[in-house]
Amino acid sequence: DGDGAAAAISAAAKLLTMRARGDRLPGDVVISTHVCPDAPTRPHEPVPFMDSPVGIATMNAHEVGEEMDAVLSIDTTKGNRIINHRGLALSPTVKQGWVLRVADRLGTLLETVTGEPLVTYPVTTQDITPYGNGVYHINSILQPATATDAPVVGLAIVAATAVPGCATGASHETDIAAAARYAVEVAKEFGAGQLAFHDQAEFDHLVARYGSMAHLQTMGALPAEQ
């Protein structure tokens, strides 16, 4: 179940190679991930999930920094019957409890990298709330959105049928490579100011009209559950 980590490390290796050759990107790129050699599995519908001995809040504290202006979260998202596509799928942008529209340029870049039409997937309110609140989440791909005010987009590595990501033989190297290439392309354009994860004016208008949704980034009125 290490597709996301492998993609992140691959993107880091590519950026280091580019830098060594004098091809430096404008802006800073922060790449963070975690690798656990003995992660447990836990029951989840429709297939078992890979769990972690470290809580999501702890991982967010180490992986999501205040200096980040935007976050691209890469994660295996195969254990569901919602996404019926093999390859990569892009989430809508999530910011401070709001699910915003899919960023046009992010979608165009994904089409360029994969050579296929853009595939996106539905994000529920539950999916953008913190783990530990007792509700169903499709997976942890958008958990970084609970730890930052910056816009977050999930890049899901997906399958055409429900596949346990923790199963052996379930990783597809070409999809991981495409995810890494996409991350590099996003970093190039975002750092150069040629790409936005969201429309800031539109977001400000939503908040002015309907109010803050930042309470969805918290446990709300009840204590955390196991």
Named regions from a protein language model:
Residues 1-34:
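Alpha-helical metal-binding/catalytic segments enriched in His/Glu/Asp
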Residues 2, 47-48, 56-58, 89-100:
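Flexible, glycine/proline-enriched loop segments at strand-loop-helix junctions
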Residues 21-25, 62-66, 144-149:
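Solvent-exposed alpha-helices and their adjacent loops that cap or buttress functional pockets
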Residues 29, 33-40, 78:
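Acidic, glycine-rich active-site loops and adjacent beta-strand->loop/helix elements
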Residues 35-51, 140:
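Short, electropositive alpha-helical surface patch
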Residues 47-72:
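A glycine-rich helix N-cap at a beta->alpha junction
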Residues 70, 76-223:
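Active-site-adjacent substrate-binding region
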